[in-house]
Regions:
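Substrate-binding cleft and catalytic face of glycoside hydrolase catalytic domains
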Residues: 50, 78-213
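Acidic-residue sensor for enzyme active/binding pockets
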Residues: 23, 183, 218
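N-terminal structural segment of carbohydrate-active enzymes
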Residues: 2-110, 120-123
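Single conserved hydrophobic/aromatic residue that forms the stacking wall/gate
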Residues: 214-225
Length: 225
């Protein structure tokens, strides 16, 4: 006799996006430049995401898909209505760090960025959709890369903690479920996207990657929030 298997009551069915995959509006309402913005499509993409070719701003002759993406920043109400029509019970999304702290090291957040996500979360609840939020999905403000070297620098822990405190305080009651990082292991394979890492000629890349892994995994092990 075959045993009937069922999902438990309250199981969260849904879908997922990342901010850089869908939001677009890369410079709207005070948002700062991020590493994911300057990753182009084309033959140089691999050398850029692996940190061997530096691209810290937009350059002529390249197409940057994250600049516009699917423009969810301006169309999220339409998108979430469709999620509701599909029967989503949860929506996993990520926060664009540079929409909250444009440079990453500011003391005070960007109110327009906070308001955007607050409205988005409220729209989810309107359709009975539980937000599941990844704090960082391949996303680092460019200033933290050019000024501090990305996650090779332990100071990133303080900036990340400030981001977390800001999010947890502002969205208390709107978001129950939080994830720290998406695919930390990608530091080893796509270090510019995974941790904002770029390498100098002759630098010990493996050493930098594993040092960054130590830093970036600390919030996951024991977030001090």
């Amino acid at each position: 006799m075959t045993k009937k298997m069922t999902f438990p009551d309250g199981f969260l069915w849904g879908g997922a996006t990342a901010a850089n995959q869908c939001e677009g509006a890369f410079d709207a309402d005070g948002r700062g430049l991020a590493n994911v913005d300057v990753v182009p499509i084309g033959e140089d993409r691999l050398s850029i995401i692996t940190g061997r070719r530096k691209m810290f701003d937009f350059e002529d002759g390249y197409f940057y898909p994250a600049k516009e993406s699917i423009d969810m920043y301006h169309r999220y109400k339409e998108d979430i209505a469709l999620f509701g029509e599909m029967g989503f019970k949860t929506y996993r999304l990520s926060i664009a760090w540079s929409r909250i702290f444009p440079k990453g090291d500011e003391a005070e957040p960007n109110e327009a960025g906070l308001a955007f996500y607050e409205d988005l979360f409220k729209e989810c609840h309107k359709y009975g959709i539980e937000p599941l939020v990844t704090i960082t999905h391949f996303d680092c403000p460019m200033h933290l890369i050019t000024e501090y070297g990305g996650w090779r620098n332990r100071k990133m822990l303080g900036f990340y903690e400030n981001l977390c405190r800001t999010l947890f305080t502002r969205y208390k009651g709107l978001v129950k479920y939080w994830l720290t990082f998406n695919e930390i292991n990608m530091i080893l394979h796509a270090p510019f996207m995974g941790a904002g890492l770029c390498f100098e000629e002759g630098e010990n890349e493996e050493q930098v990657k594993y040092l960054s892994l130590i830093h970036i995994s600390e919030p996951t092990r024991h977030l001090r929030i």
